[in-house]
Regions:
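Hydrophobic alpha-helical transmembrane segments
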Residues: 1-259
Length: 259
């Protein structure tokens, strides 16, 4: 059974690379994370991962014309690379190994917390730019261009809740979660995404293009190095994702232990 799931992970990584949803490093990391998750949770864990990556990839294709301006702001656009896969799935990999060694239900919930938070954040990032109005920046309390880190819109917030609930409800059917656990997974997922927005506003590094003056997460814009403006220099988008999903999931894990 394990060999079959690993073969499935290999097929998934190859498909993602073939359709340019993953870079080569992203495909390799997908294979590693998927294999670890299948070792801990079997095919059920892989289905949850597939729902996350699949739904996120599909949403990334929606409204591409509107998202072109976002691509010039965000640090990474297009195919997911290895660091992005690790940022979203690294802790899930650890939770799967911990579950395999202990068979402790709390580690299954930890896995779901991580995926729900990642899915909520990704859905918000993909759905938010479809809004007809620019989002509000938590840092300046003014409207900011779509795709700006630390900015929120109504439709993006709806995407956050829907993304977390999607994973929680799917997990209910796959793992027979109780209603309490469904609510908890959804809540932690939303909390993780909101933390990501907050950290993006106050801590994520920001650059400014020396050619057009646009604020961006990219180190290079219009073929020229960008100028550092604010934020913690080592805190890029991937680091924020790891930090916030880990913090939210850790809080959820503590709640499970004492609730």
């Amino acid at each position: 059974m394990l060999s079959a799931t690993i073969l499935f992970c290999l097929l998934l990584a190859w498909t993602g690379r073939s359709f340019r949803l993953l870079t080569t490093s992203g495909a390799i990391m997908t294979l590693l994370v998927g294999s670890g998750v299948s070792f801990g949770f079997g095919w059920q864990g892989l289905v949850v991962l597939l729902l996350f990556f699949g739904s996120s990839s599909l949403l990334s294709k929606v409204g591409r014309s509107r998202k072109q301006s976002v691509d010039s702001i965000v640090e990474k656009d297009g195919a997911r690379d290895g660091w992005q896969v690790l940022a979203n799935g690294g802790l899930a990999f650890v939770a799967a190994l911990a579950y395999a060694m202990t068979m402790d239900f709390a580690y299954l919930l930890l896995f779901l917390f991580v995926i729900a938070a990642s899915n909520a954040d990704t859905w918000a990032s993909e759905i938010g730019p479809l809004s007809k109005r620019d989002p509000w920046s938590l840092k300046t309390l003014r409207r900011a261009p779509a795709g700006t880190s630390g900015a929120m819109s109504l439709i993006g917030t709806v995407g956050t809740i829907a993304g977390a609930a999607f994973i929680a409800i799917a997990a209910h059917w796959i793992f027979s979660l109780s209603l309490r656990d469904v609510v908890l997974v959804t809540s932690i997922g939303v909390f993780g995404s909101l933390l990501d927005t907050l950290f993006g506003a106050v801590g994520q590094r920001v650059y400014r293009c020396t050619v057009c003056g646009e604020y961006t997460e990219k180190r290079e814009h219009h073929g020229q190095p960008t100028a550092y403006v604010s934020g913690i220099r080592f805190l890029g988008n991937d680091a924020v994702n790891v930090l916030t999903s880990g913090l939210a999931s850790g809080i959820g894990f503590i709640i499970v232990r004492f609730w």
